[in-house]
């Protein structure tokens, strides 16, 4: 028979995800007794006891499921928090706040549209209301197609900016719907414009949400993260529906009160959206983040971590960078003669060709068929460094000398400066790339905007492929 010490000695342990482990020891009757059941927090599943047993008692590894752990399994991805990115929880909390505010604003807007269509008005024409509705919907459908064609490939590059833009545009659309009944003669045009904006919101918001889900999913669990996000949104919308049922009767007869509530809810919506987007920490480089990281590297010799760079990334002005950088342009945009091609290729050992227009501060890059992600990063870095030569701020020695040459001799051929910066990058870029990887950036992929053009040209035998 085992003595008391051996009975208390743990036979084995178990844990759920990153939750605290609990041990199992032998009970006096020879059964297994699991301890620590009551200490488990909401970040791990609560143990469930078998019928007739108490939590932590012998005979079963699980205690009764608590309410919080039940909500966790319903609303959060399996394996949370290890199965998602570190910014998942703050983003989802602020996203839920903005969804709640948007739900209430949407109720006010829907009420206004229904009033404008004649709901509750005996003199209203069913055919007129139907025609208005059809015009509104068809306008929105066209807008959805046009935006997907026009900006679809660019939504990944600036997902945070487009996400914020979409939600602000949604507020504008709801404002138009609330104002529409006040001007009956323009009602159809107003609600059609509003629905056009909402369809743009649907495309931009849905696409960027998918991009953010890819970022959040850390165990190839995109479907689970997306499904739980949908569940969270449904719960928030249900709460918004219940509050709307109480709010609408109070404001329905007072347009000014309705408009005042809308303004307050819109302010909350925009603030929560800003906080949600600002909470995101994306580890891939787009042009804005690359420029921030590169500037810091050139000035201080160290690479910003993703958390710091994301906090500094502009959210309102990210669509209009000071430098016009075009990657993957057709080769015929860069050269128009054999001499220009030879001039551009000479001394070019990387699988890209770069042309810099100093007067327009415009950089165009033609990529080789063999160009990989690191080549694109180097080309973008090259272009941003050329742009930095025309701006203020500290630079390393060789680049500071090149800037002095640019300022002293504005007529100096740009292709000469491109070649000289190539030589600087041969030393600088490997250090920069190593620093990016050490800081936590994912350099095997990027979110730089790159067109599909690729080219071949007479190559130096020293050409590199990254």
Curated annotation (Swiss-Prot):
The modification N-acetylalanine is found at residue 2. It is found in: Membrane. Keywords: Acetylation, Membrane, Transmembrane, Transmembrane helix. InterPro entries: RUS_fam (IPR006968), UVB_sens_C (IPR055412), UVB_sens_RUS_dom (IPR054549). It holds the Pfam family UVB_sens_prot. The chain crosses the membrane at residues 245-265. Its main location: membrane. GO terms for cellular component: membrane. It is a single-pass membrane protein. Belongs to the RUS1 family. This is RUS family member 1. It comes from Mus musculus. The lineage of its organism: Eukaryota, Metazoa, Chordata, Craniata, Vertebrata. The gene is Rusf1.
């Amino acid at each position: 028979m085992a003595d008391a010490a051996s009975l208390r000695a743990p036979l084995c342990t178990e844990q759920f995800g990153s939750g605290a482990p609990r041990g199992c020891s032998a009970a006096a009757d020879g059964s297994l007794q699991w301890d620590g059941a009551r200490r488990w927090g909401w970040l791990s599943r609560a143990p469930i006891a078998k019928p007739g047993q108490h939590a932590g008692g012998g005979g079963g590894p699980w205690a009764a499921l608590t309410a919080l752990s039940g909500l966790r399994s319903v609303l959060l991805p399996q394996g949370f928090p290890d199965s998602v990115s570190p910014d998942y929880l703050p983003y989802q909390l602020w996203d839920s706040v903005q969804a709640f505010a948007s739900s209430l604003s949407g109720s006010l807007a829907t009420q206004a549209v229904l009033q404008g269509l004649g709901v509750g008005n005996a003199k209203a024409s069913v055919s007129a209301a139907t025609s208005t509705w059809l015009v509104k919907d068809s306008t929105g459908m066209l807008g959805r197609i046009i935006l997907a064609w026009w900006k679809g490939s660019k939504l990944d590059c600036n997902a945070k900016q487009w996400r914020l833009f979409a939600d602000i545009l949604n507020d504008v659309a709801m404002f138009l719907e609330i104002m529409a009944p006040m001007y009956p003669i323009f009602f159809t045009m107003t609600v059609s414009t509003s629905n056009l904006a909402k369809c743009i919101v649907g495309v931009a918001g849905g696409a960027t949400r998918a991009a953010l889900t890819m970022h959040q999913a850390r165990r190839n669990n995109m479907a689970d993260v997306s499904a739980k996000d949908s569940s969270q949104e449904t719960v928030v919308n249900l709460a918004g529906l219940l509050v709307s049922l109480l709010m609408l009767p109070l404001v329905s007869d007072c347009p000014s009160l309705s408009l005042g509530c809308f303004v307050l809810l819109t302010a909350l919506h925009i603030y929560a959206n800003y906080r949600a987007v600002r909470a995101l920490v994306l580890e891939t480089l787009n042009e804005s983040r690359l420029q921030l990281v590169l500037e810091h590297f050139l000035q201080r010799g160290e690479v910003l971590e993703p958390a710091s760079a994301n906090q500094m990334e502009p959210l309102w002005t990210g669509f209009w960078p000071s430098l016009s950088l075009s990657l993957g342009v057709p080769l015929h945009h860069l050269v128009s003669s054999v001499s220009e091609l030879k001039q551009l290729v000479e001394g070019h050992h990387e699988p890209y060709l770069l042309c810099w227009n100093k007067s327009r501060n415009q950089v165009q890059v033609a990529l080789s068929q063999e160009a990989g992600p690191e080549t694109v990063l180097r080309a973008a870095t090259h272009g941003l460094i050329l742009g930095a030569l025309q701006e203020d701020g500290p630079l390393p020695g060789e680049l500071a000398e090149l800037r002095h040459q640019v300022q002293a001799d504005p007529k100096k051929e740009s292709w000469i400066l491109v070649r000289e910066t190539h030589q600087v990058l041969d030393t600088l870029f490997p250090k920069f790339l190593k620093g990016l990887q050490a800081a936590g950036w994912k350099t095997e992929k990027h979110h730089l905007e790159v067109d599909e053009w690729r080219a071949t040209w007479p190559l130096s035998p020293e050409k590199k492929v990254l």
